[in-house]
Amino acid sequence: MTMGALGVVYGDIGTSPLYALKEAAKAAAHGATVTPDAVLGVASLILWALLLIISLKYALLILRADNRGEGGIVALLALLHARNAQPGTWRSHLLVVGLVGAALLYGDGAITPAISVLSAIEGLKVDAPSLAPAVVPVTVVILVGLFMMQKQGTGFIGRIFGPVMLAWFAVLAALGIHGIVKAPAVLAALSPLYAVEFLIHQDFHVSFAILGAAFLAVTGGEAMYADMGHFGRLPIRLAWFAICLPALVLNYFGQAALLITDPAMIENPFFQLCPDALHYPLVAFSAVATVIASQAIISGVFSLTQQSIQLGFLPRMQIRHTTSDAIGQIYVPLVNWLLAAATLGAVLSFGSSDALAGAYGIAVSLLMAITTLLAALVAIQWGYSPWLVVAVNGAFFVIDVIFFSANSIKLFEGGWFPLLLAALVAFMMLTWRSGVKLVEAARAKLRQPEEDLIETAVNKCSARLPGTAVFLASAPRGVPLALTQFVKHNRVLHERVLLVTVLIEESPHIPDEERAEVIEIIPGITRVILHYGFMQNPTIFDGLTLTCRQGKLPGIDLSDITYYVGRETIIPREDVPGMWVWREGLFAFLQRNAERSAAFFGVPTKQVVEFGTELEI
């Protein structure tokens, strides 16, 4: 598991040495020749950012806030029960903050592959400046190949991610030692005083520019928490403290040592650390490492999308499982191509890692601040002393805010790009969430109580059709609109009627023994509630198969079932209380293009009948 964590969790932060110290040193030089004191200050700042933010905050503190083993901002929202918060309550405001945090990951997901692969391919320019025009085209080719590969799954090549990244961290350490040996005075930067004194003696704007650039060294730290469910807390901590942290510190200090001895190397100190004979192999290896880092963030976005759909934060989309023997190997076509468009747009628009550095960091720093806040609320909910939580999380929150403020000065240098992407995603999430509530309220007005169904079954539908009918119900109460429509048009019921509702719980996984809740309304009419976790695939056919196997639905032949599914057409109306009509129009568009319920819940296509209903919101 530790090896797996190396390949998935630490790909992003592991490739930060390609650009982080370079950008921080350039900010410290602010157009002049970088001085040894500036280099020591930058190296010290990066070291203590890694220790405070990654080692202390994430590895030791945030990883404790798990939702039955799962991490990430969506898991935090589930722990805080924000999904069903009433409008106007503090939890409803918390939901908005949390969804903004989730949306920021999409902005990060577009920037990370762009800056990572660009920074690796830019190594070609070190020995051959004439190759500079090829950097962007080569980057585009690599990224197009990466996104095209997603539909095939990464099961096979994913197995080599860990060993490849282990070799990468070994190379980072070796390069760093090679540089430190030439200028051991760089080890003085181990003292935090160098970072503090250096920042104090700088102009305010320069200090913020340096902080914003140094923050690039810790981007990717959020993956430690987001991927906790895949690898576990202990392997993630072990990989960080035993392998990643030492290798990163050695490499950053090696680059700093190189700049102390030769400030002219500031354009690309990472590749200048390497002996000339190994330069091009290092460029190739860097490209492989950045592809692995990009794959990790793409897979993370797919996983976040799945969780958000399950919890009702995003419209249903087609989700393909790329392998049957590995949990979590999924492919979301729509998200893949939207992310590809955003990433390629970033590469073509900004054109270099230096330019993209301005766009990178602001979304991640805001996300880290939101994570710290939500984790503090979870700790208080779990019974920790509020004073202790405020003291500990408050200190980290101040650090997060400082870094976010420092990154905010890059807003017009490219920081707007990930924030714009995040704003669009957050707006869509909030619109979808509000629209779903309006639709459910409209359904509730039309939904008949169970008593009416009983009366209909006993007095008006004495004749029964052979076989079993399954009616999908959005709520575990009342009569589904599809059943009401069926009785209205046919004036008959089947011998067995199952009202099936899928409920997504705020836990990542629900065990099989707790999957089905079976309630007999009257003989022949049964309500079945299938419970799934937000990390599970909610398949109705599999759920009913399990329920029958458990003996809760005797006499049901699953091959002789007809599934009746309602499909609503949303009609925005200005005279009906709700959202602004243009937002209702957006919701109607999203709902119209969402994955159909039957397909999303894995209902056998040859056994489905759909009933249409118009709903005004």
UniProtKB/Swiss-Prot annotation:
Its main location: membrane. One of its GO terms (molecular function) is symporter activity. Keywords: Cell inner membrane, Cell membrane, Ion transport, Membrane, Potassium, Potassium transport, Symport, Transmembrane, Transmembrane helix, Transport. The keyword Magnesium does not apply. The keyword DNA repair does not apply. Transport of potassium into the cell. Likely operates as a K(+):H(+) symporter. Belongs to the HAK/KUP transporter (TC 2.A.72) family. This is Probable potassium transport system protein Kup 3. The lineage of its organism: Bacteria, Pseudomonadati, Pseudomonadota, Alphaproteobacteria, Hyphomicrobiales.
